[in-house]
A protein has these predicted regions:
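N-terminal intrinsically disordered, cationic/polar leader segments
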Residues: 1-96
Length: 96
């Protein structure tokens, strides 16, 4: 239970950062954030970002990229298998 609370707090911070980035991106036409799910509607397609508390991961999927999984590397950062942090990765997609 404690790990799910930790995940919920960290993922909420990440989702808030992603929403803030989406609001600044000229590529993002619309976005929505609702209870562990962020939807980004970009010119290149829709992106769905979902927190998976039971796995301790955040999943990003779209037709443009397929799917990417981000996990807690040291209990503080969500990274993909290449070691790239999720917010940095999203910045590239949003061209910020």
């Amino acid at each position: 239970m404690n790990s799910e609370i930790h995940f919920a707090k960290l993922s909420a911070v990440v989702f808030d950062e992603i929403v803030a980035l989406a609001g600044r991106s000229p590529l993002c036409d619309e976005y929505d954030c609702n209870e562990g799910v962020v939807e980004l509607f970009l010119r290149q397609g829709a992106f769905l970002i979902v927190g998976k508390a039971d796995l301790g991961e955040i999943w990003v999927s779209s037709l443009a990229i397929g799917a990417e999984r981000f996990y807690l590397d040291d209990g503080k950062r969500f990274v993909n298998k290449s070691g790239e942090e999720i917010v940095s990765w999203i910045k590239k997609i949003l061209q910020l």
